[in-house]
Amino acid sequence: MEIPENIREKLALFCNVRKSSVIQNLTADCLYAVPLMLEKEGLGREICNHLRLDSYIPDNTEWIEMIDNIRKIKKDEKVKIAIVGKYVRLEDSYISVIESLRHAGFANNVNIDIKLIDSETITKETAESKLKDLDGIIVPGGFGNRGNEGKIETIKFARENNIPFLGICLGMQMAVVEFARNVLGLADSNSAEFNESTKNPVIHIMEEQKKIYKKGGTMRLGSYPCILKQGSLASKLYGKEKIDERHRHRYEYNNEYKEILSFR
C-alpha cells in the first residue's frame, strides 16, 4: 500500500524535511527489486541534492535484466549445495559465499538450495547420511584446528563420489591434505599450522612469515600472480593461464610435494 499524499505531507511537516524527501519502501516480491523501487521514489536524487552533488539518471539495464531472470526461475529447478564449515550457527559468517552462490543461480536460471553443515558433525560414519544427494560441496576458509578432520572427511566423500567440490582458503589446503593422506598414502600428512611435528607438511608456513612473531595484522595480503596448469579446469574457467588473485594467508602449499601430487 502506497503512502497517501496527505500522509506524505504530514510526515514531511513533522520531520522537517521536504515532501520529496519522504521515501517509501514497499514490500517487494524480490529483494533485488528494492534498489529500483527506491530509485523510482527519487532516493538517489534526494541524496545528491542533500550532499550538493551532480545528479544523473543511472543505467540500470543490467540490474533490470537480472531481476527479470530471477522472476523467470522455476521454483522446482534447484541445485543443492552444501557449505561445510564450523561457523554455520551464524549464517552471516559465510555471507559472501552464500551471496555468490545465489548470484551464480541467477546467472544459470536455477534456485540454489544452500545447506549449512557443521564440519564437527562429519565423521567416517556420518558422512554419507549428511552429504548424500548433493549437487556440490564447498568447504570455505577458517582458522584453528577445530572441525578440520570433518572437513577432510567431507572432501574425501566428495572425491570418491564425484561430487563437484570447491575449497576456499583453508578448505583448499585441507583438500591437499586429504589427497596426500588417502591417495598418496602419506597417512600423517597435515598442515604445519596444526601439527608442527608432522613428517609430511604438505601445507607449510611461507618463507617470509617464519621470522614474524607478532601474529596480529601480519598475514600476506593483496593480489599475487598464479600460473594455472595448461588444460586444467581452472585455466578453462579463467580462460587464461596466468591470473592474479587476492590472498590473505600465512600458510601455503609446500612445493616440495609438487611433483608427487601433480603426477597423480
Regions found by a protein language model. Give the residues of each.
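N-terminal beta1-alpha1 cap of cysteine-dependent amidohydrolase-like domains
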Residues: 1-264
